[in-house]
Amino acid sequence: MRILGIDPGIARVGYGVIDTSNGQQQMLDCGIIRTNPGIDDGERMVEIASDLRQLIRRWKPQLAAVEKFFFYRSSTTISVVQARGVIIMTLARFRVPVMEFPPMQIKLALAGSGHAEKDEVLDAVMRELNLDQPPRPDDAADALAIALTGWFQR
């Protein structure tokens, strides 16, 4: 099964693609979709949707796993929620099933504790995907953790 993990954001959207068809998890790709901070949020949403469409066409995921947020008053909350909506809509247009996970569930699935530190989750990502080096940037590593959670929780 090919799974696309997504760490939503407005400035940077992390993505990670894993394949599980050979009995073990393998990283195929990871990175970020970076938007131009000099344009309005609507145009940034167009950039996110366009780049995500390219990823979907390239990797043809059978499942998407997206981080679900619970915000407590933040100036970027509305923009990130809007970006997340664009991501979910784009996946739906390509008929990619979506699973959503809050951060604590991702930490629990990978590190065994919903209160695990970021480095514990990163260690689990490296172990599960048999990586010698940590994926960079952090948003991409987070997206791989989300993809793995999708695999474990499917």
Swiss-Prot record:
Q: Which reaction does it catalyse?
A: Endonucleolytic cleavage at a junction such as a reciprocal single-stranded crossover between two homologous DNA duplexes (Holliday junction)
Task: State if Magnesium is listed as a keyword.
Answer: yes
Q: Where does Mg(2+) 1 bind?
A: 7, 139
Q: How is the cofactor bound?
A: Binds 2 Mg(2+) ion per subunit.
MF term (GO), any: crossover junction DNA endonuclease activity
Kindly give the PROSITE patterns that the UniProt entry links to this protein. Answer: RUVC (PS01321)
Which residues act catalytically here? 7, 67, 139
Q: What is its EC number?
A: 3.1.21.10
Question: What's the short name of a Pfam family annotated to this entry?
Answer: RuvC
Note the PANTHER family from the entry.
CROSSOVER JUNCTION ENDODEOXYRIBONUCLEASE RUVC
Q: Which family does it belong to?
A: Belongs to the RuvC family.
The protein's matches in NCBIfam families, at most eight in alphabetical order, are given as:
PRK00039.2-1
The UniProt function text for this chain reads:
The RuvA-RuvB-RuvC complex processes Holliday junction (HJ) DNA during genetic recombination and DNA repair. Endonuclease that resolves HJ intermediates. Cleaves cruciform DNA by making single-stranded nicks across the HJ at symmetrical positions within the homologous arms, yielding a 5'-phosphate and a 3'-hydroxyl group; requires a central core of homology in the junction. The consensus cleavage sequence is 5'-(A/T)TT(C/G)-3'. Cleavage occurs on the 3'-side of the TT dinucleotide at the point of strand exchange.
Q: What is this protein called?
A: Crossover junction endodeoxyribonuclease RuvC
Q: What is the lineage of its organism?
A: Bacteria, Bacillati, Cyanobacteriota, Cyanophyceae, Synechococcales
Gene responsible for this protein: ruvC
